[in-house]
Amino acid sequence: RCAAFALDCFTAWSRGLDEQSTPEGNPLPPRRVVTLRLRAEQRRAIVIGDVHGCAAELQALLAKCGYERGRDVIVCAGDVVNKGPSSVDVVRFLRAEGAFAVRGNHEEAALAFATGAGDARSKLIAEQWSWTAELSRDDLAWLTALPFAIALPQHNAIVVHAGLVPGVALEDQLLKDLVSMRGLVPRPCS
């Protein structure tokens, strides 16, 4: 009985249902899943993954795609920040463009470090996350509002950062899978 209760508590924690926070301790976004329907004047949804703070490369990629503001919609599949030299510039560019994005594990870590959620500051390397001090309130609000999935019904597609478990309804997926799944094959017992 205790084991079943513990499993229920772990499942709720993994889904981010305890106290309305994610497993990292960040607040949940207003909506876990956003449905994006392209308007008549919008011709494409350009889906880009793992920008990792590389603003120049993002702009070059969009130019190569023939991106047209107002006609195309940018959809980022998480990890828009960290590792590269200009995470704050990437966030501000995406905000200015009205881009959509899902929250990946690097957004989760950045939010936790910037806000001191959970015990992130003791776990994370300060130099790797020092750029978060440059984020404005609006930048943090944008990152916090990122959903964990974006449905694109016109394309019969769902954008997540990491993965979806086959056979599990989108609303029942665990946050840890949407944000940081590494594979579908169960690991053998050691």
Functional labels for PLM-detected ranges:
Residues 2-92, 97:
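N-terminal active-site segment of His-dependent metallophosphoesterases
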Residues 87-190:
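Active-site neighborhood of divalent metal-dependent phosphoester bond hydrolases
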